[in-house]
A protein has these predicted regions:
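Exposed acidic/polar residues on beta-strands and adjacent loops within beta-sheet cores, strongest
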Residues: 20-157
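N-terminal signal peptide c-region/cleavage motif recognized by signal peptidases
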Residues: 14-19
């Protein structure tokens, strides 16, 4: 019985260490969306591998938020598959169809370090994917590539 009681803390320590190690490449960033009185939280999937999985975009209203409580009023969200590690989330002007787009970037796990990105626009009650690019060179102009993708999508209609 004594031996089992000693083994239990050791087993817990191993499980806790494994859970922490699986989350070393996690990503969480809050991005202000001031024109809509919103804030977006972009986060990679918990306990997923670094090289593949998903990320979430959660949008909260800040219209009536007290300081420090800007993620209390959930409005909408989106879940997107990813092939690589989420590296950044930021606002960008992508032209007339997406003047205040939320951009999420990823870097592939392969030797080329290729870059991909998705652009989202928000409304008072929705978040919508407007463009996606993949396989870009590591030093590519992501905003320009997304603008071009939006233009192609518009011309295809």
């Amino acid at each position: 019985m004594k031996c089992r009681m000693r083994a239990l803390p050791c087993a817990f320590a191993l499980v806790a260490a494994h859970a922490h190690a699986a989350d070393d490449c996690s990503f969480v960033k809050k991005v202000e969306l001031p024109a809509r009185q919103q804030v977006a939280v972009v986060s990679s999937g918990a306990l997923e591998p670094c090289s593949t999985g998903s990320y979430a975009v959660r949008v909260y209203s800040t219209a009536h938020a007290e300081p420090g409580f800007d993620t209390d009023d959930y409005v909408t969200g989106a879940l997107h598959a990813r092939d690589g590690t989420v590296t950044d989330a930021f606002m960008a002007d992508l032209g007339a169809r997406a003047p205040q787009a939320l951009v999420v970037t990823m870097r592939s796990a392969g030797s080329g370090g290729y870059v991909g990105a998705q652009a989202y626009v928000t409304t008072p009650r929705a978040v919508r994917l407007v463009a996606s690019v993949d396989g870009l060179a590591p030093d590519a102009d992501i905003a320009a590539a997304l603008r071009q993708a939006i233009g192609k999508r518009r011309n295809a209609r």
